[in-house]
UniProtKB/Swiss-Prot annotation:
Keywords: Amino-acid transport, Cell inner membrane, Cell membrane, Membrane, Repeat, Transmembrane, Transmembrane helix, Transport. Pfam families: EamA (PF00892). This is S-adenosylmethionine uptake transporter. It comes from the Bacteria. It is found in: Cell inner membrane. Its main location: membrane. It comes from Rickettsia typhi (strain ATCC VR-144 / Wilmington). The gene is sam. Transport is inhibited by S-adenosylethionine and to a lesser extent by S-adenosylhomocysteine. Unlike eukaryotic transporters is not inhibited by sinfungin. Also inhibited by 2.4-dinitrophenol, suggesting transport is an energy-dependent process.
Length: 294
């Protein structure tokens, strides 16, 4: 095995670790959401996330928290609060696999938002594929049938919030340190979550607190795993493996919640996955063309 292949395989392994951690987070969130309100889950999740990040702040020094965009950090925190509370609540309504497929639609929302917020020009092929992707969502959610539960739309609202976060990150991540973006968004989300969570407060058990700590700290681990992966392989090379999360989620949901993906989820995934893959590869090609022309 040559060195290039070894590096590639290591990078993919790091990326797969991020997928496993993400799936574990969804399973934990669904479990906690059956007893604790999503506001309270968000409060503890980001409180523990802030605590976990504190040693890194001390190590790198206060200067790493200096920011020119405090309003942007507040906006990110508000979006994260809305997105995570909607996602946690949605997980109590829908199967984990359905939520996972909906998360695959985030690039579709990001593309549309980029047109209005970043004034990006989108080629017609990407518009066509985006429409196809949304058709996949409709196929999966079945809004035209009596089985449709409107509360599943909380997951769609969460996906839109995460797409908004992607847009903000795309515009400001080069101007801010990664640590400051993580720390401030966690602090803001915890602060915003506290007063609303008091309305629905249920004192967590020691086991639930342990799970909440895992939930809070694992977000940083996901970022670490992704950064390690992207130092070894190109982000585009990991794109096909992104959808293994559906397999991981399906296995976890089956053994823990006795859930099994229905046909509509499978049909929706078959439509959404190729659509988002095309968008990612198209964006990569567009970025490469821009660099070559400079």
């Amino acid at each position: 095995m040559n060195d290039a292949l070894k590096t590639y395989l290591k990078g993919i392994c790091w990326f797969l670790l991020s997928l496993v951690t993400s799936s574990v987070n969804d399973v934990i969130s669904k479990y906690l959401g059956t007893r604790l309100h999503s506001f309270e889950v968000a409060f503890f999740r980001f409180l523990f996330s802030s605590i976990v990040l504190l040693p890194f702040v001390v190590y790198y020094g206060k200067s790493t928290l200096k920011t020119r965009h405090p309003v942007i950090h507040v906006l990110r925190g508000l979006l994260l609060f809305f997105g995570m509370t909607s996602w946690t609540y949605g997980l109590t309504i829908a199967p984990v696999t359905t939520a996972t497929v909906i998360s695959f639609s985030i690039p579709l929302f990001t593309l549309i938002l980029a047109v209005f917020i970043l004034n990006e020009n989108i080629i017609w092929q990407r518009w066509v594929v985006t429409v196809v992707g949304f058709i996949g969502l409709v196929v999966m959610l079945k809004p035209h049938t009596k089985d449709f539960n409107p509360e599943i739309l909380y997951l769609i609202l969460a996906a839109i919030s995460f797409a908004m976060l992607d847009i903000i990150n795309k515009k400001f991540v080069v101007k801010e340190s990664m640590l400051s973006m993580l720390f401030y968004s966690a602090i803001v989300t915890a602060i915003v979550s506290l007063p609303v969570s008091m309305e629905y407060w249920i004192t967590p058990s020691s086991f639930e607190l342990t799970l909440l700590f895992v939930l809070g700290s694992s977000g940083s681990f996901i970022l670490f795993f992704l950064l390690k992966a992207f130092t070894m392989v190109d982000a585009t090379a990991t794109a096909p493996y992104r959808y293994l999360e559906l397999v991981i989620s399906a296995i976890a949901a089956y053994f823990i919640f006795n859930e099994f993906p229905d046909k509509s989820t499978a049909h929706g995934a078959v439509i959404i996955i190729p659509a988002t893959l095309f968008i990612m590869y198209s964006e990569k090609k567009s970025m490469s063309s821009k660099h070559e022309s400079q």
